[in-house]
Amino acid sequence: MENVPNVYFNPVFIEPTFKHSLLSVYKHRLIVLFEVFVVFILIYVFFRSELNMFFMPKRKIPDPIDRLRRANLACEDDKLMIYGLPWMTTQTSALSINSKPIVYKDCAKLLRSINGSQPVSLNDVLRR
């Protein structure tokens, strides 16, 4: 056999030569501030309308039924009539859902059962 030289490998430990200046407290603060800034921008982009609604004063939305509170119901024969509507000056026939006048056999008796001898307002009927 030939004489083959033996090669021995020894582990080599190399110390890192870079300094750990990247991990200083000052650098971390900048990264944290940048992340917080990005988070605020994302919150603003995705929740802009919600933030505007939160900081704006709430508008009072008028109740559409408030205009009907002064209206009263009355009977003309067997026909139910409404008077006192703000946009109408005369007595008008009350209409059902299918836009036909409401005709009830004992109309006056029905109104007395709702509010006794007092005039029946539309508000009394809507609250029941």
From Swiss-Prot:
InterPro entries: Poxvirus_L5 (IPR006956). Pfam families: Pox_L5. Residues 52-128 are virion surface. Keywords: Disulfide bond, Fusion of virus membrane with host cell membrane, Fusion of virus membrane with host membrane, Late protein, Membrane, Signal-anchor, Transmembrane, Transmembrane helix, Viral envelope protein, Viral penetration into host cytoplasm, Virion, Virus entry into host cell. Most cysteines are linked by disulfide bonds. They are created by the viral disulfide bond formation pathway, a poxvirus-specific redox pathway that operates on the cytoplasmic side of the MV membranes. Unglycosylated because produced in viral factories instead of the classic ER -Golgi route. The chain crosses the membrane at residues 31-51. It is a single-pass type III membrane protein. Residues 1-30 are intravirion. Induction: Expressed in the late phase of the viral replicative cycle. GO terms for biological process: fusion of virus membrane with host plasma membrane; symbiont entry into host cell. Belongs to the orthopoxvirus OPG099 family. Interacts with OPG086/G3. Component of the entry fusion complex (EFC) composed of OPG053/F9, OPG076/O3, OPG086/G3, OPG094/G9, OPG095/L1, OPG099/L5, OPG107/H2, OPG143/A16, OPG104/J5, OPG147/A21 and OPG155/A28. Except for OPG095/L1 and OPG053/F9, each of the EFC proteins is required for assembly or stability of the complex. Component of the entry fusion complex (EFC), which consists of 11 proteins. During cell infection, this complex mediates entry of the virion core into the host cytoplasm by a two-step mechanism consisting of lipid mixing of the viral and cellular membranes and subsequent pore formation. This is Entry-fusion complex protein OPG094.
